[in-house]
């Protein structure tokens, strides 16, 4: 029997997580464990908690919330505390409410859950559902169908990537999708705002907000294809070295020494 570990960054009560658990329980004969943050941890990136203890709080059969933990905490502690005899065959992070595309990947707690898994040697996928602000309820039907297909492929054929690589998968908001595209991550144009105010004690504070997020016009990027109605799959690697720039930096450093 396969073993699956699930986490997310929207918290243990999120709709996307509930829908994912229901589908996996119905479609796969697998031992499923869920460890999710006790509260929403969106945009927490790959942070881990080093300054205080964390505890598992059981909320169901093999279902735990991690008190004030991040997605990376959830995966790391689950692997080291809950899996004594055998590690999971797959870690799934999601389904996130909102896309994780372009450089958003570096901010994403959803993607960080998958990152932590592959750092620990476990194949992983990150799942995110794009939606429009006008939508009152998210339709996860397409996301669940595609996720089922991808997981079945992984179990039947093995994971398609090397070590320390994961699949970042995004689903479009449209009810009828055009298909699935393997593509590169796009490039965001960021514009963050810092709103200042004063609390009742007279102390100034700031509240960050993302405003007018846009993207560069790249025809075959995850962002562009997602907006056209395609589900996108982007292989992500954790090797951050800019190899093509190493010679340039070496020459630059040598020139500075002369």
Curated annotation (Swiss-Prot):
Chief location category: cytoplasm
Coiled-coil ranges per UniProt: none
Example of a GO MF term: exopolyphosphatase activity
EC primary class: hydrolase
EC number: 3.1.3.5
UniProt KW keywords: Cytoplasm, Hydrolase, Metal-binding, Nucleotide-binding
Catalysis: reaction(s): a ribonucleoside 5'-phosphate + H2O = a ribonucleoside + phosphate
Ligand binding (a divalent metal cation): 9-10, 42, 96
One matching Pfam family: SurE
Compartments in which it is found: Cytoplasm
One cellular component term from this protein's GO annotations in UniProt: cytoplasm
Stated role: Nucleotidase that shows phosphatase activity on nucleoside 5'-monophosphates.
Family per similarity comment: Belongs to the SurE nucleotidase family.
The protein, known as: 5'-nucleotidase SurE
The organism of origin for this protein: Campylobacter jejuni subsp. jejuni serotype O:2 (strain ATCC 700819 / NCTC 11168)
